[in-house]
Amino acid sequence: MSNIYRDVTLNQVSEQDIGKTIRVAGWVENIRDHGGVSFIDLRDMYAVMQIVIRDGKLLEGIRKEQAITVEGLIEKRDEETYNPKIPTGTIELDAKEVTVLGEVYSQLPFEVMTSKSVVHEDVRLKYRYLDLRNQKVKDNIIFRSKVISYLREKMTSMGFLELQTPILCASSPEGARDYIVPSRKFKGKFYALPQAPQQYKQLLMVSGFDKYFQIAPCFRDEDARADRSPGEFSQLDFEMSFATQEDVFAVGEEVLSSVFEKFAPEGSVVTKAPYPIISYKQAMLEFGSDKPDLRNPLRIIDVTDFFQKCTFKPFIGKTVRAIRVHADMSKGFHEKLLKFATGLGMGGLGYLEVLEDGSYKGPIDKFIPDDCKEEFRILAGLEVGDTIFFMADKEERAAYYAGMIRNELGEKLDLIEKNAYRFCYVNDFPMFEKDPETKKIGFTHNPFSMPQGGLEALNTMDPLDILAYQYDIVCNGVELSSGAVRNHDMQIMEKAFEIAGYDKEVLKNKFGALYTAFQYGAPPHAGMAPGVDRMIMLLRNEENIREVIAFPMNGNAQDLMCGAPNEVTEQQLREVHIKVRD
């Protein structure tokens, strides 16, 4: 679209325009003086073009990052000056007129071209509008837009309706801490920002909508991690009526496989449907985590029963896990791995090496009776050249230690599969867990999940033995999504909440809409919600999720650019009946 500022965008200029006078606009990325002739690298959202300045007066007052418009003649570059790194690398614009549209009044806080690699994150976030001019940063946000557009197209093509749910809702006692919003009209009462559209999407199913989705903003007052942005995040939220766990799996596979195959870097391998399904119990045993990274070929085995027959006291009465590795490892490697293990809190890291003659070498060898060594070789699948590491503690800690050692071995021995996106489902999560401090029973995952075995299981089984129809999608060790078959039966819901310490009145008060709606013919329904930010982080090979969000908070949940959270006036506080206490 041509206007007073530009005739075309920079990516639209080509060798076909040689000899034409055109007007372009953008930002001054760089200025180079070659003695009598100067060059400006002009950047807009789409490309970079070289501007030739032969009249020195045109360059007066021109500085980096000014917004300018330039009119001039498109010329062919000398062949020896071609720049194959940019689309306009064979042409340049001989400037006849340069006009500053947006002045730079202050010294730039950093060099835009190198901000992503050399500038501290807090400085980048304070001046995010400058940081976003960096092409690598901008490309992440453009990529994000394309992925979200594709997700919408895909879901719509599969018969899902895109529906929006409220941002101001009621606080409820599950999940992370709520962000709460005081009411002006109702003294002492509060709204909450939704941690997820959980209740609303279930109510849509009760309302008779068959398949719903939205790119949902979610708000949780929780600490940041590399794969978790504090404050808010986005998820592809979807729900289906009259659906089973397997139906949700099929949709998840179709959507994620297609988006990763379309947007993953060239040459990447993406898991084909159907994805492997790993139970929570199996995941904790074989991978030491409920977020298994299947790119790592190492597996954990349980050798607890075997070591109860041995005389190694540190293993007696404990859960013992082991990892078999076939690789050459120096003394220095073992020392570094031991240091890593003790840094986790382990008292040591026992190991055995299998020698050429089939005998063992290592600090634990003497504690394994000779008549048991063949049994152990078969149990662990040991071969000549193998090394096997041992982790022993209470079951939960042993699993954690084994998982961390598995990850460290995979990384340090370069065993992780390259250019691959390995998906799996983790299912059969425990419905309930016991708080180690209070000893009270609570929900493990989602309180609205259907327990396996229904009401009979709730009435007859130990709560800690009950499994739920809950599931996660994991990719490369990152939890992309959680979901569940929902508990749509009032009797089952009341009993489940009773076990978790909530009486019927709490259920009515905190989840009143669901409680009431489920008395009017609620259909079976199920769904999940893959995280959009995490999806894009994986596709862009970024280590920090904030790199794929346009205006993220920093790790302390602060918006350094706009100054949130900030103080408000006494009048504003009075209007919402709030008094700040020291």
For the regions a language model picked out, list residue spans one by one.
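Class II aminoacyl-tRNA synthetase catalytic cores and aaRS-like
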Residues: 1-582
